[in-house]
């Protein structure tokens, strides 16, 4: 995979992420903020973006989304194949809820 193809893929992921984030925020702001790991300031910015601004942001050569965990325990919980998937997901959600919301510095 060449550099240009990777950059195209990053732009596509960025646009999909931004569109999904806006949709989630419009439908249930509080749940979206929790699921996206963002604070109210970021939510306000995202919800107000025009289509032109979305495309401009998506055109960045860096990913706008990232993994919300740096803890290997959360990664192990999310990838485990235990029988009680709902309990496993709840456990991961509890651990991730303790992670701070992202801030723009």
Curated annotation (Swiss-Prot):
Write one Pfam family the protein is assigned to. FlhD
User: Which branch of life, at top level?
Assistant: Bacteria
Q: Which UniProt keywords apply?
A: Activator, Bacterial flagellum biogenesis, Cytoplasm, Disulfide bond, DNA-binding, Transcription, Transcription regulation
- GO cellular component term of the entry, any: cytoplasm
Q: Tell me the function of this protein.
A: Functions in complex with FlhC as a master transcriptional regulator that regulates transcription of several flagellar and non-flagellar operons by binding to their promoter region. Activates expression of class 2 flagellar genes, including fliA, which is a flagellum-specific sigma factor that turns on the class 3 genes. Also regulates genes whose products function in a variety of physiological pathways.
Domain remarks in the Swiss-Prot or TrEMBL record:
The C-terminal region contains a putative helix-turn-helix (HTH) motif, suggesting that this region may bind DNA.
* Protein name per its UniProtKB record: Flagellar transcriptional regulator FlhD
Record organism:
Nitrosomonas eutropha (strain DSM 101675 / C91 / Nm57)
- Which gene produces this protein? flhD
């Amino acid at each position: 995979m060449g550099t240009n193809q990777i950059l195209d893929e990053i732009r596509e992921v960025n646009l999909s992420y931004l569109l999904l984030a806006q949709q989630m925020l419009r439908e249930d702001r509080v749940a979206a903020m929790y699921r996206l790991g963002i604070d109210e300031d970021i939510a306000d910015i995202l919800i107000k973006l025009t289509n032109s601004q979305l495309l401009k942001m998506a055109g960045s050569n860096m990913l706008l989304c990232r993994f919300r965990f740096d803890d290997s325990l959360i990664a192990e919980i999310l990838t485990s194949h235990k029988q009680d998937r709902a309990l496993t997901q709840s456990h991961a959600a509890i651990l991730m809820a303790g992670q701070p919301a992202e801030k723009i510095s």
